[in-house]
Amino acid sequence: MNKSRIEKVIIQSKSLNKEMSMLVYLPDGYDEAETFPTLYFMHGRSGNENFITHIDLNVVSDRLIEANRIRPMIIVCPNMDNSRGINSSLDCKEVLDPLNRTINIGMYEDYFINEVIPEIDKRYKTIRTRDGRYIGGASAGGYIALHNAFRHADLFSKIGGHIPAVELQLEDEDKAYFRHQGDWEKYDPITIAKEMTCTDFKVYLDAGDKDEGGFYEGCLILNNILKEKGIESQNHVFEGHHNVEYIKSNIEKYMLFYGN
């Protein structure tokens, strides 16, 4: 019987001035081994830390680890609210976007980089170098993963953007996150990639052929930029829409990327 487990970690964030939580998957054999690589996996716009079980990430990981198809690893799914994972406001608060939807603004990049990662490294038996630290995410979480990895290339060695919300321009519905065009460009994965000097990591991009956001276009452009820089990047267009079913149908492929 597999003895993996999921733990809930709650911290009082100084960056956001509120309590934040995350779920942490510990693989079978965690207590016996010395250290493990760590995958940070980011949820989408309407998700939270429960995304890890919502997409069966723990179940698929159990199966692949048991079959020796991937290396055992720690998986962390932090709650990032509906924030895009950026530093958008010194004051953490909820605001309405142009479509009257609630979004969260605050120092979310600082929260993840300066609080979540150090807390996980302190609590768990992680490999505390970039070679043993990976980041990925789906939809808005894919956007979070890409910009955090590109802006902090010294921290991560594998990066995954799965149906990532990579836009070709600042859309009206996203203007509540960004004060002006310059703020958008600061976090736009395509813009960052053009200026990036670090090339020592592996990147996995994918989107559905019927993705309602057309994010396969951004993935193609980003992949071409990365490959021109000599970065080991792969881009896939699989069958499907922009939904949870697409993620669940491809999660095994993602884990084979992170785990090998």
Where do the PLM segments sit?
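Non-catalytic cap/lid and distal C-terminal segments of serine-dependent acyl enzymes
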Residues: 1-260
